[in-house]
Amino acid sequence: MEVQRAQVGSERNARAGPKVPAWMGGQRYGGRTGVLLCTHFPSSMSDFAAFGAPDTTDFASTRVATAAAAAAAAFTAPASVPASALAADPELLRRAYRLMHTAAAMATLYEEEKTVAARYVHATARGHEAVQLAAAFLLTENDYAAPYYRDDAMLLGMGLRPFELMLQLLAKADDPFSGGRTYYSHPSLRRPGFPIIPHQSSATGMQAIPATGMAHALAYFESQALAVPGNEESRMRNEELEGGKHSQSSLPVSASKPVVLCSIGDGAMTEGEVAEALQMAILHQLPIVYLVQDNDWGISATGREMRAMNAYEFAAGFPGLRRLQVNGADFGSSHAGLTEAFAHVRSRRGPVLVHAKCPLLGHHTSGVRREWYRSDLATHQEQDPLPRLHQQLLAAGVSVEELAALAAKAQATVRDDWAEALAAPNPDPATFANHEFAPPAVTAEAGERRPAGAEKTLMVDAALHAVDDILRDFPEALFYGQDVGGELGGVFREAALLAKKYGDARVFNTPIQEAYIVGSTAGMAAVGARPIVEIQFADYIWPALNQLVEELSKSCYLTMGKFPIPALIRVPIGAYGGGGPYHSGSIESTLLTIRGIKVVYPSNAADMKGLMRAAFLDPNPVIMLEHKGLYWSKVPGTEDAKTFEPATGYVVPLGQAAIAQAADADKLRRGETALVVTYGMGVHWAKTASRDFPGQIEILDLRTLNPLDFEAVTAATRRHGKVLVLTEEPLMNSFAESLAGRIQRHCFEVLDGPVFTLGAANLPAIALNVELERQMLPSAAKVAAALGELLAY
């Protein structure tokens, strides 16, 4: 194939913005950036055979050139759709053509203006425009989408203005997605007339699980004959959108069943979390299209370096997953294949994977430039979807003049929008902390804590009854995790009989997939479901941290409050005598380093029931740590964990500590008292230890670790002047040590001694042997010794 380099334009012309390409009678795209353009337009994918002859003229690295050539040789896809088939909908083709020019002009402009545009890292769709637009055109306002960071053309296809995308590129205050808080082409959108797009992170493959969670929520609502929340409102197109700044969608109004589109790159397909998502989509036959855009590059690694098979071949290992291949560089092929995929999912309600081969014409990102390592640019350039569509439109009878006018209009829009975006205001620094959390639903204790006729109940039963009440009262609620469904109802019987009562669609087992269990809640919540999930043991939460950190914790903040995630995550925790190194751990300090989540840790049955319901009602992700040693009150000294059971509907607000034991008023006046600040099992160790010091010990039960009731802590500290912070965790670098430091700083003038701390030994695991476990952990005797020393100080 004949390949030429774009001519370097004058400085004046470069600043003027993108020009009409040479094949339309004007200058080539690229300006001073030197973008390669082909003068021969392949008519079918047989031309991809030439993808094995990279131009290495400007690249010195033989190793990189060899790898690139190997990648190019593997670049194959199905044949293009004939021009005669495309002619059936010329308006669709014109729209695709105009938006391809828009996306290409934006990419070129960003290069020409890189001093400004590359201040913040970004990636563009160059080479992927055809398949992205084809997908966007098939979405309706009832649908849900999870794009990835190279999908700016897809966003244009949904109807977003270049101006809106540029606001995010420049991190401006009016960025409609994040208000300047996250990267270009990281959308979050909840706007009438558009698909719903929840928070999107940069971590590769992260979107697969939340997207599958969205599909799971849709399937759940359908199984219960419930309306999907928000779909009725989404059809109200006449609502004024933010003073007219933002675009109206060009998507069709549709009463068809909603679907989810998950867009993902080929490099991300090797992530283990993607396999978890596919497993669940097939197990539950969820309505989702996985669109894999395969350009054979993962930054500088080629496909042959990073995978044993492509996505289409990988999908063959998942029976029940329909798979299709399209030529992602050809709009007709992409639209035909995706039309089939969407139709299947809308009617059959099962998952489809579409594998689209695409050339990568731009940089990986503005910070990792193609010329540093790629020698296959010429061969990729030969598959540019824009000149291909140009030729197909000519063959369909559209005139050169009309195409030139469409291109010129697109480029003028890009230039005008760029000027408007540059002039837009930056965020007000005073707003930097807004939207860490959505406002809580419960702000005060409500309901009867000890109703007439109440009997004492175990913590495990209080938890069970709380979830039972929630499932009865809230049809959007569902409960899932390992072993919570079916006959068992949880390894601690904390979900006993719930599956039988509410059905397998609402209470069900999952595979051993902690990442899915947690990450799916982000998608569930975006659709309007209210998930309660369980990690079977705290020791096994670690695979879920990726989703917890990147998706759940950041969503509310980075979407400016549009997508808080109301998810209740139950985690049995703590040692209970012989549980050993993988069933006894305490993890609260790790969780408390994650901003944007709330952490609750009850010590008795009444608080368990009240906090469980409040946590469910909270519009933010809440982790409920439930001590296994307190579930049954079988551990000596934990009898007080049994309490009278509160009435249905009882709530305890998150972030409110409670005095579990007060000191004697006379001893308090004489300065003979001390304060224990603790939670969970620590409350019971402290109660037992305090018997050695009658009337001298106040115990403050934190109940919620984040948000922390530090006001209650400081008030109690000022009453006593002597403080012990008690935890079950290893003490070094723990939450307890941090809290002790805060008390020391804020209450220094009223302290009568150093703030004491007590926790487990600083060891990596809890030993299986119960005698070794006792040596490692705090106990009532150890607490009593510490209190004796503190009181005598």
Label each PLM-derived region with a short phrase.
Residues 112-117, 182-201, 258-261, 296, ...:
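Glycine/charged-rich beta-loop-alpha catalytic/anionic-binding loops adjacent to active sites
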